[in-house]
Swiss-Prot record:
Residues 210-451 form the Peptidase S1 domain. Residues 21-40, 182-209 form a propeptide. It comes from Notechis scutatus scutatus (Mainland tiger snake). It is found in: Secreted. GO terms for biological process: blood coagulation; induction of blood coagulation in another organism; proteolysis; venom-mediated blood coagulation. The lineage of its organism: Eukaryota, Metazoa, Chordata, Craniata, Vertebrata. This is Venom prothrombin activator notecarin-D2. Pfam families: EGF, Gla, Trypsin. GO terms for cellular component: extracellular region; extracellular space. Gamma-carboxyglutamate residues are formed by vitamin K dependent carboxylation. These residues are essential for the binding of calcium.
Amino acid sequence: MAPQLLLCLILTFLWSLPEAESNVFLKSKVANRFLQRTKRSNSLFEEIRPGNIERECIEEKCSKEEAREVFEDNEKTETFWNVYVDGDQCSSNPCHYRGTCKDGIGSYTCTCLPNYEGKNCEKVLFKSCRAFNGNCWHFCKRVQSETQCSCAESYLLGVDGHSCVAEGDFSCGRNIKARNKREASLPDFVQSQKATVLKKSDNPSPDIRIVNGMDCKLGECPWQAVLINEKGEVFCGGTILSPIHVLTAAHCINQTKSVSVIVGEIDISRKETRRLLSVDKIYVHKKFVPPNSYYQNIDRFAYDYDIAIIRMKTPIQFSENVVPACLPTADFAKEVLMKQDSGIVSGFGRTQSIGYTSNILKVITVPYVDRHTCMLSSNFRITQNMFCAGYDTLPQDACQGDSGGPHITAYGDTHFVTGIISWGEGCARKGKYGVYTKVSNFIPWIKKIMSLK
């Protein structure tokens, strides 16, 4: 009986096995879905290791919280996370004028230096004319706490309040033909060095110099005027200021009995083509001190106030080859123009110290020389109405016959008269500079004379 009972129990157990298996084990499809995961959990060893950004966020994709655990600093976490999510928005250096860029998610923020604003710090807040000339193309003045721009005669202020728009084709200071050529054709600026003290000269030369200049092509020096004496000879230069006014040096006027003017010429040997313009009146500054005069020996100095204006009988006809230079304001000339590297001088004077005058108009660029160096270089008094320009070692200068001619300084595309060729000690001598009448000191006088009927 016992063996039969044991057999029944074994059969019953074997019959129940398939049902038990189906209750304990899931089907493979369901089991795979249940066990699927995207990231394994850190092992106990990993959890106790110090945070490592490469392990947490480079080898695997991490969350912001995991990054924070690594840096343990909110600011560092934000900086990392902004780049981690969508790249560095500051990599292209979008902030202008040395602004500081801070990356964000899908954006960036620029922190601007004082006087700058805008998303990219691209807008300059010009609250002073001393900062970039107040962003003015021509003249700047301070009105209350802001800057106000204005333009030279024959220009209109642009709608942006900064630019200057020429009213006509022949507005002052426009060098149409040379605009894209001047930089390539003129010598590079040469830094002046300390002047060499030379043996004392007996007298300053009343007419200074264009030595080793370049030919000025037709229309590239359109403000150049030439003064002709009663013999038909060139004896001085001048600067066209208006249809009826030519600026020149006072010492030129007492060199001849009569004066005629030529404009628009670059080759004065062709007498058959040149047209002499008649002079109506000449205004010489009443304080001008001629050389070897009574006043020179008392309390004034030779060639001080060396300025004169010629009034024409008939208006000068402007063209591409004949354009007046712009007259600056006194502040603009002193604070902006005369702080440029260099100016431009031109003329038909001697090409060597003892050479002949040139039939071809010559032009050179001459660097401004600081006043202290200027005074050390000369054996003669440099007054407040004078300034120096030129090279102390490079043999380039103006020379006899150039006197009265233009010293021009460009600002942007506009050319302003800044000086009058006045005097020098020889021509292109080592350690010596050309001396020019400082036009900025005479703006009121010039305007007064030009306003006379």
